[in-house]
Amino acid sequence: MNINVAELLNGNYILLLFVVLALGLCLGKLRLGSIQLGNSIGVLVVSLLLGQQHFSINTDALNLGFMLFIFCVGVEAGPNFFSIFFRDGKNYLMLALVMVGSALVIALGLGKLFGWDIGLTAGMLAGSMTSTPVLVGAGDTLRHSGMESRQLSLALDNLSLGYALTYLIGLVSLIVGARYLPKLQHQDLQTSAQQIARERGLDTDANRKVYLPVIRAYRVGPELVAWTDGKNLRELGIYRQTGCYIERIRRNGILANPDGDAVLQMGDEIALVGYPDAHARLDPSFRNGKEVFDRDLLDMRIVTEEVVVKNHNAVGKRLAQLKLTDHGCFLNRVIRSQIEMPIDDNVVLNKGDVLQVSGDARRVKTIADRIGFISIHSQVTDLLAFCAFFVIGLMIGMITFQFSTFSFGMGNAAGLLFAGIMLGFMRANHPTFGYIPQGALSMVKEFGLMVFMAGVGLSAGSGINNGLGAIGGQMLIAGLIVSLVPVVICFLFGAYVLRMNRALLFGAMMGARTCAPAMEIISDTARSNIPALGYAGTYAIANVLLTLAGTIIVMVWPGLG
């Protein structure tokens, strides 16, 4: 039996898509020296090669992939977006204006220099900026410009041609730039991300070692009785000195939970709970006594639970005011908006904060009831919330603003980004709502991005050879200039005028360019999601400005002579 692979792939969009993804992901794992190509470039190269062989895919797949990615970016950025935006919103607006404004001016200059018409110039701007809103804005303005039909048809054709010829140039150049531009500065992105995390209490080091408390039991001997000198447990302050807590005492065969007034006596058997290093700090008079291995005395179920702060008697209080150790519990982590914070007695608790607490199961339950509730982890995604907010995002994207003779809309991407931010923000403040496991979120985000890249390559590859004629070289040069020069200008402005943190700055630059694949590379370089906060800050603003740029370039073109 003969199988025609070309016909098989052409007749099955789903098969073609996953063949492209599989081959591209394999290619992305290849290394050239110390440089790994990466998934984005691997999928793009494979899809471009197959696109040149006239394989095509339904454009709905491209759109769905991009929308899933943008929505997930919003969900990840949501917990901290508003605190970051209200603090840096002016900077994000100015960065987006500098990026879009400089690209617009450069594109107009190059268009006049090479003698192109408005269609090629606007298409080159849209492609170099990898921005569909520019294309939409320019096309809509051309249709309402009053051109005669033949001239309008040529301009619209050239608009698409310019976009097709420069889109890949803009995308690849920015992806490469995102990988190497951070290395040209003195401060690496990982350090910058850690710096902003420390400054704003967004400690993202989730790999910190956390030890569970352990239980050891000792028999009180003469040395220990002499050390206590008749003082009760409150006066001894064993926890303050060592970090260990006397959980139980067996006296005359009777087990009891001691209070602060208890005094240790000869022959008592005591169970101490604490971290390993806390046991090491105990006075030698504890350890010199005979250690006891008593099943009943040591029979404690140590658990670690995540307690959500909710009750009014805990919200607004300092961490020290909870007095967890007085209740035999140990604090391991403080998590706010899905970001781990430094453990500090002066941290003021907010509603929705998550405290990771260890201790005896009964004591942890008592503490949880007092300050909130125990978070029940699940590996099941709240698909209802996911789908509902996705629909809300699409509806927001349909909103259109009309100004005299031109109009611009939010677009699906901006709407979904905003909806994702809202879902992430609400999940952070109401942990029982909209739960999405991080693994599921990462998988959907990565899959959406790869589908988008596959669609771009297959769509652009089929027609790119047709445009490489007399203007091919000019388009390559112009595309590179418009793609990279505004990025450099934006970096200099953000770094030396606005003095922004580098991790937020690079994320914001990728958002101002509305380039999702490049943002993913920046996040990988920083080994943090903090750049996504900057990306989300400029993305929605840039989408509006880019739509206006498409309109403005058509409107000012005739006046340039």
Swiss-Prot record:
Q: Which GO molecular function annotation, any one, does this entry have?
A: monoatomic cation transmembrane transporter activity
The segment(s) forming the RCK C-terminal domain are 200-288, 292-373
For this protein, the parts annotated as crossing the membrane are 8-28, 32-52, 66-86, 94-114, 158-178, 383-403, 406-426, 451-471, 475-495, 540-560
One GO CC annotation, please? Answer: plasma membrane
Which Pfam families does the entry mention?
Asp-Al_Ex, TrkA_C
For this UniProt record, the keywords arranged alphabetically read as follows:
Cell membrane, Membrane, Repeat, Transmembrane, Transmembrane helix, Transport
The biological processes this protein is annotated with in GO are: potassium ion transport
Q: Which family does it belong to?
A: Belongs to the AAE transporter (TC 2.A.81) family. YbjL subfamily.
Q: What is this protein called?
A: Putative transport protein YbjL
Task: Look up and give the organism this protein is from.
Answer: Escherichia coli O1:K1 / APEC
